[in-house]
Amino acid sequence: MKKLISAIILSILSTSANADDQQTFVFNNLQGDFTTCYSYYLLSEEGLKKSGSANDETIAGLNKSADLSLESVFMIGQQLGMNTDTMRNRVKTSFESMKKEMGEDFKNFSSVLDKYAIFCKYLIEKTDDRVLFWEDKFK
């Protein structure tokens, strides 16, 4: 999966100089998507651990998806020339925002689950489709 995301980013970078604005637009939005999903996977893992209802395999899967999302956030951020503190702050802001969405109470986690579960699954599995989505939005 890391190789796929790297290949997608490299393909965007290889476009003509006229596409700089589009590239920046796509990268900014894609990084925002991965930031959101990183927060989602972290909260999911935390909630399942607190509830005691998840097995080790589920927790490992969420952890793997969170790691991949975070690596993507930083890889894309580097391409955008963002410094590490800016990227960390963006992640922290996203995480805090998502906690507020559920009223900082895991009893309300279903609202976050409904909003992000499928989106984040597809972002991880079909990153190239999301790149195309943002490219189309730019036009």
Give the label of every model feature segment.
Residues 61-139:
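Compact alpha-helical subdomains of small soluble proteins
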Residues 13, 31-32, 114:
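Processing junctions and N-termini across compartments
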Residues 18-27:
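Cleaved targeting-peptide boundary
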Residues 4-16:
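Sec-dependent N-terminal signal peptides
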Residues 23, 36, 139:
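Charged interaction segments
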